[in-house]
Amino acid sequence: MNRNRINSCRIIHGDSRSILPNMTEKVDLIVTSPPYADARKKHYDSIHPDEFSDWLSSFHKAFYEILKPNGSIVINIKDKIVDGTRHRFVWKTIEKFCELGWYSIEDYIWHKTNPMPGYWPTRLRDGWEYCFHLAKSKSPYINQAAVKIPTGKWAEVRLANLTGKSAIRHNSENNSGFGRDLTKWVGKERVLPSNVLSLPLVGKNMGHPAVYPIGLPVFFIKLLCPEKGIVLDPFAGSGQTGIAALQLNRNVILVDNQRNYIEVMTKRIKEVAKNFSTQTLVDNFDIASYQINVVKKTP
């Protein structure tokens, strides 16, 4: 991929384990949502929960080698109820990645503001999914300022009811280990968000049964990928990560082993391209077929 291109997107059909080792460029960020364990078998290859950690970790080397030294990977993953209890494959998978050399930087929760209805005798509705942030180093690239949110009036309102030591509490005074000075929040226009991201499920059909909201990749791309950097989604599905990256002025590589999803994301990316002020994106849009090693350019 030519780094001088404006908002370039490359779509590749094939298995990331075979494709990524043959690519020369390094990426800044991997954002992806692997296939759900043992679900939606009619739509894509499904892995049994007992085999999931071994299966996903088989991509480890390809991911690790294509990522820059200060790069990150964000894995959106949902656990599964098996025989009435929650299977532990999610945590086994993350532990396995850490054993292979990755650092666990942060755990995020995608809070679904409109979870699917249903009834189960021993549990409630699933209203969240994991988003794990792993990195090759303990100090990956991060731009917290890019995701700060408005402070609002909560600091002033809270301080109005606090005085003296209630507003400024030091560790040495109560041995709580939680020192704080709420007065430091006064006057700040923007502050860091929490690690809980509240976003609705995607309601409309986008040619894929499990499309995460555009806000999810947008958040992580802003936070973990510099402008003009390269984002990779090795399980690209409907191309949602690609659309987010292009809108944020990043380059993107989308890989999927399902031909029908390649067609879906190609159509969606072309539609997004129409919204840009120039035709640069369309002109630079590549579709590569790894099996025949030919890059076909759209007109």
Where do the protein language model's features map onto the residues?
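Conserved phosphoryl-transfer catalytic core
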Residues: 270-298
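Core catalytic lobe of class I
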Residues: 1-264, 272-274, 294-299
